[in-house]
Structure formats: structure tokens, C-alpha cells
């Protein structure tokens, strides 16, 4: 009997900038329509989601601005475009919810992460509302105070 291959686990890429620039309202899991060389590159971890977003048009969702670097060995016979638009696979009711929400002022749809789910590559997208500059400062202050509290707790535990 053939040995079963282990499925890769975990995150491939994250968009930390989106977490900094937006309030995340709702998250969705979407499949990706990829070509073979893209899957091989993602297996090697060669992807970036910084400045990527989701474009909703004609009843479909498209991932724009993501960068998947082609491997030199995998894409020899194909002209690989690292920043091509990739189709996101969502259910109709999820697409309807996204379309309705994005029509409201201030809402956007952004990609948060790419990850493996068994042998499939999934993209976590979010319905998000843009942060103002003062919101970003408030978030940073709260994060700093949490760090100080954790540091104090750790140092108190070491003294005992």
C-alpha cells in the first residue's frame, strides 16, 4: 500500500497591513482558482498579500494586487504573471452579502490571509471599514498598554 502524503498545514501569507488599516467586520473563506505553477510557488511560501484587495464585479469576486512569485524550475514553459487577477470561489449568498455591504459608504473587501485547508488553498477575505488616523493611534496605545501589563505580570512572576 502506498504511503499517504502529509498535507501541508498553516498559513502561506498574511496581510498584516489590512489589520492595521481596517476594522474587520465579518470574515469569509473563499477558494482560489489557480494554475499549476502558482500552487507550486505557494507550497514554497512565495506569496505576498500586502496591498491586495477584492474586486466585486459581474456577480463574481476577484483577488487583485496579490503577488505570487513564480519558481524558476516550475514555470519554464508558461509565461507567468505574478500579479494576475485570480478568481475567488464563493457561494452566491456570500457574494450577495458582500455586494450589499460594499455598496455602503466606507466599506471595503480585503484579503487577510492565504492558508492550506487539507490539500486546498483558501483565502480568508474580510468585509472591513477603513480606520481614521486617530483610530490607528488609539489601537497602538491600547497595544502598548497591553504589552506593559504583560511585561509587569511576567516580571512579578520571576520575582516570586
Curated annotation (Swiss-Prot):
- The name this protein carries in UniProt is SsrA-binding protein
Q: Which CDD domains match?
A: SmpB (cd09294)
Q: Where in the cell is it found?
A: Cytoplasm
Q: Which UniProt keywords apply?
A: Cytoplasm, RNA-binding
Q: What does this protein do?
A: Required for rescue of stalled ribosomes mediated by trans-translation. Binds to transfer-messenger RNA (tmRNA), required for stable association of tmRNA with ribosomes. tmRNA and SmpB together mimic tRNA shape, replacing the anticodon stem-loop with SmpB. tmRNA is encoded by the ssrA gene; the 2 termini fold to resemble tRNA(Ala) and it encodes a 'tag peptide', a short internal open reading frame. During trans-translation Ala-aminoacylated tmRNA acts like a tRNA, entering the A-site of stalled ribosomes, displacing the stalled mRNA.
* Single annotated GO MF: RNA binding
Q: Which gene encodes it?
A: smpB
Biological process per Gene Ontology, one example term: trans-translation
Residues in the signal sequence: none
Cite a GO CC annotation: cytosol
State the Pfam families in the record: SmpB
Write down the InterPro entries for this protein, in alphabetical order. SmpB (IPR023620), SsrA-bd_prot (IPR000037), SsrA-bd_prot_CS (IPR020081)
Q: Where is this region: Disordered?
A: 131-160
Recorded family membership? Belongs to the SmpB family.
Q: Which NCBIfam families does this one have?
A: PRK05422.1, smpB
UniProt superkingdom:
Bacteria
- Is Cytoplasm one of the keywords UniProt gives this record? yes
Keyword flag RNA-binding: yes
